[in-house]
């Protein structure tokens, strides 16, 4: 149920979090050049800008991670000037850009649930962990959570076996999430020059 999980709160599953001091601007953008099903990411002094291909060959979902101040500036631009800012950031790699949706922004935070299993309640994906979108790994981590849990439960039978599988899920997936959180922090600091 997402990063602000109501289930996690209802079952008193505490989290550790860290503010990345970055905001993400998300929008849908149409470009004059085809994306050829290729994702692009540019590393700017203020943070990365990712272009993720959508089914229409000219349409992308963008995620622009930047400082809170720069985020405010970008959101205040009219569509024409925002389009120019996106094109300049990409150095014209995708041709002309035209924003197709409302621009939305949210603060980026690392979240890590200290407990992922409570009885038969299991956290996974953004309810269990969020990381900086720098390398686009957040969704992949959530899919790995689901795949691992399905694999474990499909091999188990009985109440005791299921409890053992859930403990294994929590231990294994927490370790993988911790590795990715540390890696993203290192990459963020590397690209930020921190």
Question: Predicted segment positions?
Answer:
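C-terminal helical "tail/cap" subdomain of flavin- and related membrane-associated enzymes
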Residues: 151-194
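Residue-level recognition of specific faces of alpha-helices
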Residues: 50, 115, 133, 145, ...
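Generic recognition of well-ordered alpha-helical segments
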Residues: 6, 24, 85, 145-152, ...
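FAD/FMN-dependent oxidoreductases across multiple families
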Residues: 70-161
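Conserved FAD-binding catalytic core of PHBH/FMO-like flavoproteins
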Residues: 1-103, 113
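Phosphate-coordinating loops and pocket residues in cytosolic domains that bind phosphorylated ligands
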Residues: 9, 118, 171
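Alpha-helix N-cap/helix-start and coil->helix boundary motif
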Residues: 4-5, 48, 128, 174, ...
